[in-house]
Amino acid sequence: DTYYRICFIDPFQGTVLANYAKSLGATKAYCLAKQGDDYSVGLVNYFVEAFGAENCVQEVFQEGTSDYSSYVTNAKSNGCDIFVAPVSTEAAALIIDQAATQDLGMPILAGDTWDSNVIVGAAQGKDNVKIYVTTFYQEGGNAEFDAAFKEWINSDSVNLENNGGNDMVAAVSVMGYDAYYVALEAIKAAGSADPAAVLEALPSVNYAGVTGNIAFADGAKDATRDVAFIKYCNTETAVWDLIGEQGIE
């Protein structure tokens, strides 16, 4: 009962993904989740709820799975026209390989975990793979932050290695930055670093973050978020292209 969360949450993200799938003209979705993974299973469930269970084929894979060929085959054989896979980047890279090998023939949708240079690296050169993600930030949204982040990444070879070998600005990095400063604002408001005082001050924080304004509605522990960025993986340039913003209305 002591958490506060500044990112958008899965009920919102699942609905955004479903709305975007519909905007692409999708009518039947293949949904793949990792068994026992709360994020993966939960986001699929929220997508299915918004898209319509009668329009979805659902499967799960086990921990340690390395061959995803059967899942790609099942998506195609079931006549699906969108492939939803909110899974880890490790699993994603393998799914992308299979999608390219078998010529999946339908867009892949995923959540914020896929907003990573691991994904664009895995997809580079695979022009028969179309990937869209929902996420918190698009590089270029805040030039001052982007420049400072890239300077820091390039200042140390360890930083560069930890960022996947390049200075791409991942949305999770920006979210971590904003979370730090929301906590700092709460400490300032409390006038103390005492945990109880900071916890009491957090609900009143209103912070203009890199990812947008961050505030908590009365009694809420999740920040109010009403829009997500939709990005497309450019397999030629190995960067994320901004498609636009998507809400739940």
Question: Which positions does each model-derived feature cover?
Answer:
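An alpha-beta-alpha
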Residues: 2-63, 81-82, 171
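Stable alpha-helical elements in mature extracytoplasmic
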Residues: 13, 17, 25, 39, ...
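Sec-exported extracytoplasmic/periplasmic mature domains
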Residues: 19-27, 48-53, 73-80, 97-104, ...
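Residue-level signal for short, function-critical loop segments
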Residues: 34-36, 137, 186
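Extracellular/periplasmic bilobed ligand-binding domains
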Residues: 43-139
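Generic detection of short hydrophobic beta-strand segments and adjacent strand-loop junctions
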Residues: 59-61, 214, 246
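Extracellular/periplasmic periplasmic-binding protein-like sensory domains
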Residues: 99-177, 232-236, 240-247
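Segments of small-molecule ligand-sensing domains
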Residues: 157-174, 182-239
